[in-house]
């Protein structure tokens, strides 16, 4: 599949998402490419690389920052490049971090703090160093956190940094 520029509708969806998460200036430093397959994958590339992509026709280029459809869905790699503010974030303690990286959901007792968001929102799970550990969906609004029992699931794990390790096939030993 060849890369192409995002069309007007896709660019509008992407810009809206970037602005919402405080990364509207991303497009002044990088160019976007769309690779169509089963999904419309969006890649960020340097302006220099963008100039030679058409000549090379590569299979891969840049960093996949997400997928676009009716909405823009950040990839895990994209969150590291794009998230510049504290919107829709949950910060967890060390135990919550470990469990989340093992694929578990976030319990209310593991949350150290949370920015403001509503129930059923997409949230970015961070450790105390502000590293994005993954993406989840809130089961409750941030306002409800203080009233929840510690063993109640607060954020459902959608994707985390440990997922690629769990899905790696290991070789067979004899």
From Swiss-Prot:
Pfam families: pre-PUA_NIP7, UPF0113. SMART domains: PUA. GO terms for molecular function: RNA binding. Residues 87-161 form the PUA domain. Belongs to the UPF0113 family. This is UPF0113 protein AF_0058.
């Amino acid at each position: 599949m060849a890369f192409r520029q995002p069309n007007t509708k896709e660019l509008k969806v992407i810009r809206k998402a970037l602005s919402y998460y405080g990364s509207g200036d991303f497009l002044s430093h990088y160019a976007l490419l769309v690779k169509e397959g089963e999904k419309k994958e969006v890649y960020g590339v340097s302006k220099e690389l963008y100039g030679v992509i058409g000549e090379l026709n590569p299979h891969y280029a840049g960093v996949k920052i997400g997928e676009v459809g009716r909405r823009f869905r950040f990839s895990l790699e994209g969150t590291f490049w794009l998230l510049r503010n504290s919107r829709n974030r949950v910060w967890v303690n060390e135990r919550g971090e470990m469990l989340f990286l093992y694929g578990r959901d976030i319990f209310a007792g593991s949350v150290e703090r949370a920015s403001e968001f509503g129930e059923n929102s997409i949230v970015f799970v961070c450790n105390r160093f502000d590293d994005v550990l993954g993406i989840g969906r809130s089961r409750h609004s941030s306002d409800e956190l203080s009233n929840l029992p510690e063993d109640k699931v607060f954020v459902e794990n959608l994707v985390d940094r440990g997922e690629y390790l769990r899905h790696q096939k290991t070789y067979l030993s004899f």
